């Protein structure tokens, strides 16, 4: 499963291979979310911070442990309800699981978010910016002068994050300890009437990709659903805590007797579309996101799309890479200490910053490939269809292959986005506009080189495998 060199790669299942899968889940909530010290992630807020004022439903972590029976180890996928999680916290959780991983031959621990704009801030950018602006520079000077390690202020609540670490670790262990053999089935459910793209070139995946694991022992099934839809049903500026539409998909899947886990796809500017729901005018946002999630849940549960059995085969490899920070807003946030990402200076005067992050490649069975991406990917980078010089912001072409081109035509490409880091929007270089344009995607992107840098790193990774 974990490809350390070309000899580890399997093109067909090992002899006597069989799927094994386990599931774990827990609430991230502590009961203290309304104490005025828990901020809601989703948008920068200045000068007033976004302290949580109400709890509408739950904020959870969901985990699967999966093994292809080849003897090459077990993979973990943990998905957190939250706006983002940085590589710093991903590595922190991995560190707490190090002994358990070694004892159980876990070869990869992947942690992502569903990117709700309405959960307690797990990323750090949505705290009290006024306090950060005035306090963190002084703390930086003290740390640099005296060699101290005072923690800089950000939007994370320390107690909440400790609880998040604890229950995520426990849920990983629960998933591993509950692994059982079974069969895996895959189907594609058309959901285009519920999805819209807000940005040219209007390329997006309209499918819900469902993996249905059926245990041999007759216990509860586990359904993994991969789809690309922003979870921003309550807007980006609200102060109510909600798990948004994924929470209500889960309610329907649970009613059908199955466990549920969702992984976001390439959802850069992909959002929900409510036209076919026929909602009365003035329907409150919290009610509309509930109806939207329930509708998607019923669509998934009631689907009669043909399923194919997935051969028990996983090939998996990760690669670290560095993304230049050319966005002045994020550069300022990095120097301020508001970013929890691993940001490194690559010059002596600390003026050139890069985010150290990781991407990966996964094969599930013999016909499906997955790009594991550390941010919110423009779908055209995954599937092709870039804007040409006549239609792009810079007036130039973007002469790069898509990730599907790099993978080849013999496998369908899926995207597991926001995985192991949140580096923001990953756009084509030729369509990254000025942050003064007011385009939201540019404000929360590392800059104008994220697209080409990510494509190059993915291509290098694929060359190391094949």
Range-by-range predicted roles:
Residues 4-291, 297, 304-466:
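Conserved beta-alpha junction segments in alpha/beta enzyme cores
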């Amino acid at each position: 499963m974990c490809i350390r060199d070309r000899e580890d790669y399997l093109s067909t299942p090992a002899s006597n291979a069989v799927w094994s899968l386990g599931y774990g889940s827990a609430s991230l909530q502590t009961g203290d979310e309304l104490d005025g010290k828990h901020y809601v992630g989703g948008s920068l807020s200045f000068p007033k911070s976004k302290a949580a004022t109400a709890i509408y439903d739950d904020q959870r972590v969901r985990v699967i442990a999966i093994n292809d029976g080849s003897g090459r180890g077990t993979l973990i996928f943990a998905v957190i309800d939250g706006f983002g999680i940085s590589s710093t916290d991903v590595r922190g959780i991995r560190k707490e699981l190090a002994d358990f991983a070694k004892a159980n031959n876990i070869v990869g621990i992947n942690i992502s978010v569903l990117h709700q704009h309405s959960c307690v801030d797990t990323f750090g950018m949505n705290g009290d910016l006024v306090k950060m602006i005035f306090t963190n520079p002084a703390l930086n000077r003290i740390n640099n002068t005296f060699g101290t390690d005072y923690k800089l202020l950000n939007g994370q609540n320390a107690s909440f994050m400790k609880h998040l670490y604890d229950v995520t670790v426990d849920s990983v262990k629960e998933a591993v300890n509950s692994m059982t053999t079974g069969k895996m089935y895959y189907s594609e459910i058309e959901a285009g009437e519920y999805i819209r793209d807000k940005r040219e070139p209007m390329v997006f995946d309209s499918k819900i990709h469902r993996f249905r694991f059926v245990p041999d022992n007759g216990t509860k099934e586990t359904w993994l659903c991969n789809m690309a839809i922003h979870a921003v049903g309550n807007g980006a500026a609200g102060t109510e805590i909600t798990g948004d539409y994924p929470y209500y998909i889960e309610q329907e899947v649970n009613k059908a007797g199955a466990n549920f886990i969702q992984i976001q796809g390439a959802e850069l500017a992909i959002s929900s579309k409510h036209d076919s729901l026929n909602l009365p005018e003035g329907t409150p946002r919290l009610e509309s996101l509930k109806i939207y999630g329930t509708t998607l849940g019923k669509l998934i549960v009631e689907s009669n799309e043909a399923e194919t059995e997935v051969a028990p085969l996983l090939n998996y490899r990760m690669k670290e890479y560095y993304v230049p920070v050319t966005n002045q807003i994020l550069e300022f946030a990095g120097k301020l200490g508001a970013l929890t990402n691993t940001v490194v200076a690559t010059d002596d005067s600390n003026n050139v910053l890069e985010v150290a992050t990781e991407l990966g490649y996964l094969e599930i069975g013999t016909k499906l490939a997955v790009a594991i991406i550390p941010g919110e990917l423009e779908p055209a980078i995954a599937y092709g269809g870039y804007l040409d010089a006549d239609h792009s912001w810079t007036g130039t072409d973007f002469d790069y292959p898509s990730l599907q081109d790099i993978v080849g035509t013999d496998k369908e490409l899926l995207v597991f986005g926001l995985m192991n880091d949140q580096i923001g929007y990953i756009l084509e270089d030729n369509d990254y506009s000025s942050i003064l344009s007011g385009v939201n995607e540019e404000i929360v992107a590392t800059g104008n080189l994220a697209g080409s840098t990510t494509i190059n790193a993915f291509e290098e990774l694929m060359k190391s495998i094949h």
